[in-house]
Regions:
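Basic, Lys/Arg- and aromatic-enriched nucleic-acid-binding interface segment
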Residues: 1-27
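Short, well-structured alpha-helical segments
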Residues: 14-21, 115, 153-157
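A short, glycine-centered helix-capping/turn motif at helix boundaries
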Residues: 19-32, 129-130, 150
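Conserved tyrosine-mediated DNA breakage-rejoining catalytic core shared by Y-recombinases
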Residues: 32-68
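Catalytic-site neighborhood detector that most strongly recognizes the C-terminal catalytic loop/helix
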Residues: 53, 146-162
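Active-site/catalytic core of tyrosine-dependent DNA strand-transfer enzymes
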Residues: 62-124
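Short basic/aromatic active-site micro-motif
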Residues: 110-130, 137, 141, 146, ...
Length: 162
């Protein structure tokens, strides 16, 4: 998916895919990020996420996301949404990304890939990381649920189901 976005010169998609894959963000959460959020994340290493149901959380960001934010900030004015042009509508920008995935899905190794599937992959990796760090299964799930912003073990179990 990243290769396809790169070939299509969709730098914004590369950053959005990285946010889902390496920070566990939902599609809507990615499109809520504005330039101020990105600037603060670059300074602190943590992104403030406005999540589902008005819940907020901080998630750590990796180097790939930081590099992506720097690139995106060059093309945006202060206060503007990071992934939505000033003359565009958020729901249309989100729909274009979803169509990009659908259109290019047959080229991916895993053809059933979805945007939300990137979030599932992140959940699995974080869970395994916490287990390796010595957390109990319950505590590892609790930490994953905090990263995801829902704080519910039953929802986390769904993300971790094979």
């Amino acid at each position: 998916m990243l290769d396809e976005a790169d070939l299509a010169k969709q730098e914004d998609y590369l950053v959005i895919f990285a946010l889902a894959r390496y920070a566990g963000l939902r599609l809507e959460e990615c499109f809520r990020i504005d330039t101020n959020d990105a600037q603060k994340a670059l300074s602190s290493g943590k992104l403030f996420v406005k999540g589902k149901g008005g819940l907020t959380r901080y998630v750590p960001i990796c180097e790939d996301i930081k590099i992506g934010f720097v690139k995106m900030l060059k093309h945006r004015e202060r206060g503007q949404k990071l992934f939505v042009d000033s003359d565009d509508m958020t729901h249309l920008a989100m729909k274009r990304l979803q169509n990009f995935i659908i259109h290019h899905r047959k080229k991916f190794a895993e053809r059933r890939i979805t945007f939300h599937g990137l979030r599932h992959t992140y959940a699995h990796e974080q869970y395994e990381k916490f287990i390796k760090e010595g957390c109990s299964e319950y505590d590892a799930r609790k930490k994953v649920s905090e990263l995801f912003g829902h704080h519910r073990d039953d929802v986390t179990r769904i993300y971790l189901a094979e």
